[in-house]
A protein has these predicted regions:
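Positively charged, amphipathic and often flexible ligand-engagement surfaces
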Residues: 4-328
Length: 328
């Protein structure tokens, strides 16, 4: 149950974190980095069906088709080409090239006005050379602007937070609509929300899905939820455009209340949800007049993304476990 006040929100809920659920989440996030488990999962009979639930497809045409369907239902979209932790310059260039093809396709199909793209800097070589990642991201931003849309730069683990925000700041000098992502489970994020929610800013707030040490990130679900609400307040009080990424009914209800309190109209912020998760709720929010954007991943590098989705929803892991024992 949540209790709303005029100056903030206090959440009363499960006071005891499920120890088993936390342990399972840690195991899943560790497995997300394991190439051996990736090979095992890739051969499981159920893998492809679960992948299709969360991933639009492997090709550019699949991504465009998914966006077309969402647009027909009154939903906005952000497209993400799966891939991260690039280890070669050529791979970073290939990722850039795919985004350029994607943006050209969106423009040709007249879908760019309702669709932005999300980019991970590590897929553009951030860990090899931050300047390379900036330059390639800049090319993507320029192509997006030419197509009539924009870019949101995804956030990854805490080791690249400062580098990512620095690159976003540089990109915004020429492309002011470029968005950033902040993760509520990081202890620093409430301050980041206050400092970054200036005029023209676009901030996507999510809970966070990477494995982080307690020194930098809240570990209990209750603490993460409370941080999320404090961050919502900071963004709603700011002068930017909040993009609230959550599937949690409590947090959606709180966000609607906070928007009213800060005199924000339904088109002055948006909700975001992942492709394949709570589609009925996505349609409900859009029908009620809220801007509802769906995060749509595509491509063949789905393993790490899917494992983080399972970590967020550990019940999904049971389906995979059963499939591994029943492989033919």
């Amino acid at each position: 149950m949540s209790v709303l006040t005029r100056y903030g929100t206090v959440i009363y809920g499960r006071t005891l974190e499920g120890y088993a659920a936390n342990m399972l989440r840690s195991v899943i996030l560790a497995a997300a980095r394991s190439s051996r488990i990736e090979r095992l999962i890739g051969t499981a009979p159920v893998s492809r069906s679960l992948v299709r639930r969360y991933v639009a497809g492997e090709a550019t045409a699949d991504a465009v088709a998914a966006v077309r369907t969402l647009a027909a239902d009154g939903l906005l979209a952000t497209l993400y080409y799966l891939g991260e932790d690039t280890v070669a310059v050529e791979q970073a260039h290939a990722t850039r090239d795919e985004y350029l093809r994607l943006l050209a396709a969106l423009d040709e199909e007249h879908l760019a006005r309702t669709t932005e793209v999300s980019v991970k800097l590590s897929a553009l070589g951030q860990r090899l050379d931050a300047e390379l990642a900036h330059d390639l991201a800049r090319e993507i931003c320029a192509a997006a602007a030419d197509s009539g849309t924009t870019v949101t730069v995804d956030m990854e683990d805490h080791t690249v937070t400062d580098s990512t925000l620095e690159i976003v700041a540089r990109l915004r000098e020429d492309f002011p609509s470029v968005g950033a992502v902040l993760q509520a489970y990081l202890r620093r994020t409430e301050d980041d929300c206050r400092s970054l929610a200036g005029p023209g800013s676009r901030i996507r707030l999510c809970k966070g899905a990477y494995r982080e040490p307690e020194s930098v990130a809240y570990q209990r679900r209750l603490d993460i939820d409370r941080s999320y609400v404090r961050c919502v307040n900071a963004l709603m009080a700011g002068e930017g455009y909040p993009m609230l990424a959550t599937h949690d009914p409590r947090l959606i209800e709180i966000a609607v209340d906070r928007a009213r309190w800060f005199d924000r109209e339904p088109d002055d912020f948006e909700f975001q949800m992942l492709f394949g998760i709570r589609p009925t709720e996505q349609l409900r929010l859009a029908a009620e007049g809220y801007r509802m954007r769906v995060y749509v991943p595509y491509g063949d590098q789905w393993y790490g993304y899917l494992m983080r989705r399972m970590a967020e929803r550990p019940a999904n892991a049971a389906v995979f476990t059963r499939s591994l024992w029943s492989r033919s």
